[in-house]
Amino acid sequence: MATEQTKGQSSESISSVLSERRKFPPPEAFSSQSHISSMEQYEKLYADAAADPDKYWGDLAEQFHWFKKWDSVLEWNAPYAKWFNGGTTNIAYNCLDVHVGSWRKNKAAIIWEGEEGNERILTYGELHRQVSKFANVLKIAGIKPGDKVAIYMGMVPELVIAVLACARVGAVHNVIFAGFAAHAITERVNDSRAKIVICADGTRRRGSTINLKNIVDEAIINTPSVKNVIVLKVTGEEIHMHDGMDHWWHDLMGLAVDECEPAQVDSEHPLFLLYTSGSTGKPKGILHTTAGYMVHAASSFKYVFDIKDEDIYFCTADIGWITGHTYIIYGPLLNGATVFMYEGAPNYPQWDRFWDIINRHKITILYTAPTAIRAFIRAGNEWVTKHDLSSLRLLGTVGEPINPEAWMWYHKYVGQEKCPIVDTWWQTETGGIMISPMPGATPTKPGTATRPLPGIMVDVVRKDGTPCNANEGGYLVVKRPWPSMLRTIYGDNERYEKTYWSEFPGMYFTGDGARKDDDGYIWIMGRVDDVVNVSGHRLGTSEVESALVSHEAVAEAAVVSRPDEIKGNALVAFVTLKDGYEGDAKLRDSLGKHVAKEIGAIAKPDEIRWAKGLPKTRSGKIMRRLLRELATSNEIKGDVTTLEDLGVIENLREQEDEG
């Protein structure tokens, strides 16, 4: 890494001061077998899609089953899109029925492993049968197309069955992460006006069981729309079943036949709601619709993961988040892939659970989060190196930008320097991957998502909307509609327009800062909320974090700002150390000098606090908002509903920097 000065940068730009010069071409053995095998092929595909997007997306859509073909590929009345308008289809039919009619009927769709080691395999034929049966259960319960269904379960195959059954009958699923508390469920159920809640009695996590049904009972005291609760027996928790309201999954499945005609729904028929936290106020119900989401989920999965019929693909996300929706359920099943699904924690019973899984199940593709990778680094290399990971051929990351040093560790120890890494950028709102290497074509650099997918028109712009120069930090926007884009924030079009479309008229604003390097690769610099003005320089805190993590003593770091009378803002770093290192004044000084050397004196933290752990959401993202509050006042006033471990906050209060 080295510092670089950006020329011709406007005062409205975000300073980009971190440069990465390491580059890794795709292995020849991988490229020769991949769907997109050269940059020339990628460039042509990208240019063709840019020149005629209707043809590009229309050709992809032709690969699916339609009950009635669309009249037009896109009707765009900014900021509202209608994709494949006039067509009718069913995404569950395309996930299951098309495969059941082929040799894939007996192919494994889901290989599931419970935290306790128990295993289940569902073939496409068996998954189709179970989904059809549960779709009939929903019909028995009075669910009609357009009705909302809330789902609150751990990572068990029945969660996939419930989701696809909703899609089969045209109901709108609203999956709520099984780590959320009662209040969060109440909010989401009431906002969506769900008629039914599907839950498990309990779930397993790190050797313990959590009673989910009791949480649901508390949540639905104030949810007048809920008429029925369907309960799946998973852990055998002691629960109370309310007469007339609560019904056992297995009892209802016993009443249902195993054939169910799919609802023929309009292309723009709502498919699901997924709630994402706003910086303030109530959660946003992101609405995705059927056909456009189907086309992009399937095509992005095929090309980014270079999927083959013999692959066993392991995505470590939870289905309660968008990654689980698109890249555990819909993307893989639309492609007839085999998905490995794991119930529990990555460090139970020990830190090598994932590596043991990869070895035993011969996983070929691993898609995980930088947060997990940093935790594995901290745990020690020996947990990885004692397992045979030779089955892996491709690695992926998702959820946040990956620090270059974490990328290098992933490449060396997990990929054994032979697996391409697809560092993917996308959002709940985008529905699918937007920026990513093509693993058989794109030379990768540690820490960048590289180039946009064909058909995706992104740019980095200044505050006035004009394109930035190379290496000039700016704002990441999408300049054209894409099929899997969110259609609105449910029940709040005004908030949708203001949040995503008001900052740069005619362009979707992602909320992220970014820069393009000399190769046109896009570097995500973090949320614009995390851009700090220090002595007139606007710095992306993710670059300061990357510099800190490149120090040999640092496992993880988060950098935020607090007001400063002289500088405007001061940088405060919360640092988690690797085992064997002591947080003291000498190391604090060493870290400051290291950042100054890597980036420049302007980026040197004014304050460094030692942290045993960082506050994270239940999906593993660092809650920088809480750290900003701690840095400013050492108190937390905001919402902590999505915080995974409240004990982390108390520890950070106690660890307030002595100077």
Curated annotation (Swiss-Prot):
Acetylated. Deacetylation by the SIR2-homolog deacetylase activates the enzyme. One of its GO terms (molecular function) is AMP binding. Its EC number is 6.2.1.1. Catalyzes the conversion of acetate into acetyl-CoA (AcCoA), an essential intermediate at the junction of anabolic and catabolic pathways. AcsA undergoes a two-step reaction. In the first half reaction, AcsA combines acetate with ATP to form acetyl-adenylate (AcAMP) intermediate. In the second half reaction, it can then transfer the acetyl group from AcAMP to the sulfhydryl group of CoA, forming the product AcCoA. SUPFAM superfamilies: Acetyl-CoA synthetase-like. Its cofactor is Mg(2+). CoA binds at residues 205-208, 323, 347, 535. It comes from the Bacteria. Gene3D superfamilies: 3.30.300.30, N-terminal domain of ligase-like. ATP binds at residues 399-401, 423-428, 512, 527, 538. GO terms for cellular component: cytosol. This is Acetyl-coenzyme A synthetase. The gene is acsA.
